[in-house]
Amino acid sequence: MSTVSQAMRKDLKKTTHDATVSKAAKLMRDDRVGSLLVVKNEEVVGIVTETDIVRRAVAQGSDLSKMTVQSIMTSPVVTIEGNRTIQDAHDMMGDLGVRHLGVTDRGTLVGLVSVRDLLISFKSISEPKITQD
C-alpha cells in the first residue's frame, strides 16, 4: 500500500497569522488549494481551510476583510508520519473529523496530505493496470 509521503504535496502554501480571511481565500483561489499553513515568525502555528472559512467566518456573517486567519484557523496542525500508509491517514482523518494532515519526517513538517490526495492514491491502486504482451 502507498505511503502518506507518496501521496502528499510538498509545495506548501502559507499565509501569515495576521492576514485577513479575505486575503487567505483569494490566495487559496489563485493557488487552487483548499488549505493554507498559517505561520507566525517563520513557525507553523496552524492551518486554515476552505471549510474553516465557510463555517467560522462566512456562516457567521463576519466581515472577511477585518477578520484574521488566526481567529478561525485550526491549531495545532494534526500530523502523521510520512512512512504511514494512506489507509492510516484516511482512518485518522475520519476519526478526528479533519480533511488535511501535516506530514512529518521524524517530527519535521515536510508536506500536506488532503482527502483529495488520498482519493487519487486509492484510485491509482484500485485501477486495473493494462499491459501489452
Residue ranges and their predicted role:
Residues 2, 19, 48, 67, ...:
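Short beta-to-alpha loop/turn elements within the nucleotide-binding domains of ABC transporters
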Residues 2-12, 66-77:
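Bateman (tandem CBS) regulatory domains
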Residues 9, 55, 59, 74, ...:
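Phosphate-coordinating loops and pocket residues in cytosolic domains that bind phosphorylated ligands
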Residues 14-32, 79-97, 104, 122:
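The conserved cystathionine-beta-synthase
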Residues 28-31, 36-52, 93, 101-116:
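A glycine-centered beta-loop-beta connector
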Residues 60-67, 87, 127:
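Short, charge-rich, low-complexity interaction segments located
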Residues 82, 104-110, 114-133:
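Cytosolic regulatory modules rich in charged/polar residues
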